[in-house]
């Protein structure tokens, strides 16, 4: 459960953010709305089942074990997570509507401030 994050973001909150975004029926827009409403992903995860009942949908968080495996795989690959509200998140990317809430990156992040080319992929490609 070691999700590297900015010091202002606890490991528990970093893990909860990854878990929230990886949960079924939670995309970047609903993720942002839940964080805004509850202030923390830990609180949003606790509220998911009740929100689903009231909305006539079933919302369940992805099992923590799946996220633990992902985090471990990212760590073993030498990569790290960067959240949309952390220092170092690319400023131009942040301006895009629907910008990814979480980036998984490897290498020297400070180079992103210079002109560059990025390769971007989706976990759930259509």
Predicted regions and their residues:
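Short, positively charged patches
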Residues: 1-126
């Amino acid at each position: 459960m070691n999700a590297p994050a900015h010091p202002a973001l606890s490991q528990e909150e970093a893990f909860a953010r990854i878990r929230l975004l990886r949960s079924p029926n939670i995309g970047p827009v609903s993720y942002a709305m839940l964080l805004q409403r509850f202030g923390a992903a830990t609180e949003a995860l606790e509220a998911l089942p009740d929100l689903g009942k009231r909305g006539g949908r079933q919302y369940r968080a992805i099992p923590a074990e799946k996220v633990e495996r992902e985090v471990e795989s990212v760590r073993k690959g030498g990569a790290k997570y960067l959240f949309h509200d952390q220092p170092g998140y690319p400023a131009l990317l942040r301006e895009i509507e629907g910008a990814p809430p979480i980036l998984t990156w490897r290498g020297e992040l400070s180079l992103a401030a210079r002109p560059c080319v990025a390769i971007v992929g989706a976990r759930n490609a259509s």
